[in-house]
Amino acid sequence: MNNILIITGPTASGKSKISMKIAQDNNGIIVNCDSKQIYREIPIITDQPNLNDTSVEHKLYGYVSVTQQYSVGLWIEDLKDEISSIIQQKKFPVITGGSGMYINSLIYGLSQIPKIEDSVRNETRRLFKTLGKKEFYALLIDKDPIAKCLHKNNSHQLLRAYEVIEQTGISIFVWKENAPREPIFKNFKLCILMPPRSEIYKKINERFINMINTSVIEEIENLLSLNIPAHFPAMKAHGVPEIIQYLQNKISIDQAIEIAQKNTRNYAKRQYTWFKHQFRNALFYESQDQLLESIKNSYVYYN
């Protein structure tokens, strides 16, 4: 029996809306698997659900500070605790979100890379800050030629690859390929919502305009006031870099909107390709109605 439902898909595909519908109808609780919606201080820019809405209970949203060093491994532990609690309550767990790394780890399990010592992690970040992206990237490639596949601007992945090769002497890609992995849960059904791209692009554009019309500028001002390092995940949430540039008088608000919309659309485009090739046993749906119809007889709900 499948008694855990996972709903994923590109950004702005309607995951949250369909998850709410399913949870409302079936005594469910929604659990977050979006790597940016975990952060407490940025609910608007990350489009977090309204946690004051008592019609459906939400878990793992806005519960981590942007100043905290958090990882997919910590999220997995938090997730397992929440799912265990939900099942004990005889309620229906609906896991939803679109972060590729979180979904991949949930479905296939975590790579068993040794824990990185604090001294190695701190030295890696010191080097990154001292050398800058370009020279740090060159240093990484010299130590780990396989890491050349990483994008030069993906600070998080560059730092992670460097600290792994520095501590273990083995490329992070070798660890990931050779280490045995097991799914976190075995009793799940994975549904991927993939509406036409034109629909998603339209929603992305509209969503960012709606954010600008709320207090998102103030939210990012407060984020900046915390003085957290630029490589921290929250600083790279969609729209954050562009609004920061606006606040620093480097671009206009119209330019910030246009660039953020374009970057988010490009991200959604990459997500389409990634989801199509990543999960062999997933079920794909073009619309929310298709997904709803498909799962009607697939679960024993706890009503």
UniProtKB/Swiss-Prot annotation:
It comes from Ehrlichia chaffeensis (strain ATCC CRL-10679 / Arkansas). Keywords: ATP-binding, Magnesium, Nucleotide-binding, Transferase, tRNA processing. Catalyzes the transfer of a dimethylallyl group onto the adenine at position 37 in tRNAs that read codons beginning with uridine, leading to the formation of N6-(dimethylallyl)adenosine (i(6)A). It catalyses: adenosine(37) in tRNA + dimethylallyl diphosphate = N(6)-dimethylallyladenosine(37) in tRNA + diphosphate. It comes from the Bacteria. Monomer. This is tRNA dimethylallyltransferase. GO terms for molecular function: ATP binding; tRNA dimethylallyltransferase activity. Its EC number is 2.5.1.75. ATP binds at G9, P10, T11, A12, S13, G14, K15, S16. Coiled coil: none annotated. Residues 34-37 are annotated as: Interaction with substrate tRNA. The gene is miaA. The record marks S99, R121 as: Interaction with substrate tRNA. Substrate binds at T11, A12, S13, G14, K15, S16. Its cofactor is Mg(2+). InterPro entries: Dimethylallyltransferase, IPT, P-loop_NTPase. Belongs to the IPP transferase family. SUPFAM superfamilies: P-loop containing nucleoside triphosphate hydrolases. One of its GO terms (biological process) is tRNA modification.
